[in-house]
Regions:
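Single, function-defining residue in the core of a domain
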Residues: 1-27, 31, 60-61, 68-77, ...
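Major-groove recognition helix of helix-turn-helix-like DNA-binding domains
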Residues: 41-61
Length: 243
């Protein structure tokens, strides 16, 4: 019964399924029942695992319980890796922000619209590069553009946020600037930028082509981001210019 199946039992069952690559509720049930005499030592306090009980718990219990638990575990783990080297001479906190699309069956997941023939969700993750620990995880349907999730971030002053050009929204990037944080992203090919001055670069020892400070020149873009921007161009191993 669900009432005899605690949230901790549910967590252990789903963690077991994830770590051992179980493919269905029946698969979870069969494998855990095969280890019935070891369940107590694994942390379970229920006497047996039923796929119906697990299915009901997954369907009816609020997901916020496990979201809060995940945040608690993350808060415990982050200090353990805070001093882990990044491979660059930078003491600040560095985050990478990106989204992954996970395809789903449309008939089983009609609540996750994506295309006419299939469903999907997007997993938006802010990764602390000290230890590669996620500090923010947000799930949306597949149609949600990743740039919208920037509004949900709790920005940290002095931190660096690394993003691809899918997050190039100047009004939202200016919010990061106003929070006294920093962002690094790719410029789009049609970005209009006027150089004010250039910083010296050593092309003989680095792949940096230029390091410039300037402003946006398109009317609406300059209104969205009125502060100066830094633009750095580098050459990759194939000789391609990246800005």
């Amino acid at each position: 019964k669900v009432k005899d199946f605690s949230c901790l039992d549910q967590f252990f069952a789903m963690a077991f399924a994830q770590l051992t690559y179980r493919e269905s509720l029946r698969d979870i049930e069969v494998n855990l029942r095969a280890q019935a005499n070891r369940l107590y030592h694994m942390g379970f306090r229920c006497s047996t695992i039923s796929r119906n009980t697990l299915a009901n718990a997954n369907a009816t219990r609020p997901w916020q319980i496990y979201a809060d638990f995940a945040q608690h575990l993350i808060a415990m783990a982050r200090p353990l890796y805070a001093k882990e080297p990044l491979g660059i001479d930078l003491d600040a906190v560095v985050y990478a922000f990106d989204a992954s699309t996970i395809d789903l069956c449309l008939s089983l997941h009609p609540w996750a619209p994506f295309r006419s023939t299939k469903a999907a969700i997007k997993l938006h993750t802010l990764l602390d590069l000290h230890g590669s620990i996620p500090s923010f995880i947000h799930i949306t349907d597949g149609k949600t553009h990743e740039v919208n999730v920037l509004d949900d971030l709790v920005l940290e002053a002095g931190a660096f946020y690394l993003m691809d050009r899918g997050y190039l929204d100047f009004s939202r990037l200016y919010v990061i600037h106003q929070a006294q944080a920093f962002f690094v992203t790719r410029a789009k090919s049609n970005t209009q930028f006027r150089r004010r001055y250039s910083n010296p670069v050593d092309r003989s020892t680095t792949s940096v082509i230029c390091d410039q400070t300037g402003v946006l020149t398109v009317f609406y873009s300059s209104k969205d981001y009125p502060a100066p921007l830094r633009r750095v161009a580098v050459k990759d191993e194939t000789g391609k210019r990246i800005t």
